[in-house]
Amino acid sequence: CAASIYGANLVTNRADSPHLSAKNITGEMYFACAEIDPYAPKETIDQLQDQLQQTDIKYRLEWYPGAEHGFAFPDRGEIYHKASAERHWERLHALLDRNLSI
């Protein structure tokens, strides 16, 4: 399994852009996307989701309305978005619990 907090640089103009390898993913994926994120704008995340939908990957891509890049970490000051952070950490822990034998 794998998770992406914010989704930065998952879609680029390069020939080796990560989203182009989505068909090779075998594990469950989780993507947490901030609504306000200059590093992963909606258009970029939409391209990622389009690519993911063409595969059989089990994934969850969630938007966090009103949240900015860095929302999940309390030490980010005003950027920290408590409600979104709590939901994000619940989703991430659930992903890890489902997929990792500890």
Describe each region flagged by the PLM.
Residues 12, 36-40:
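Acidic catalytic loop of the alpha/beta-hydrolase fold
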Residues 19-23, 48-49, 78-81:
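Short, hinge-like loop/turn segments at secondary-structure boundaries
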Residues 25, 31-33:
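Short beta-strand/loop motif that positions the catalytic acidic residue
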Residues 53-102:
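C-terminal catalytic histidine-bearing segment of alpha/beta-hydrolase fold enzymes
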Residues 16-18, 41-51:
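Short alpha-helix in the alpha/beta-hydrolase fold that links the catalytic acid
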Residues 10-20:
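Alpha-helical scaffolding within the catalytic cores
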Residues 1-9:
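A conserved short beta-strand
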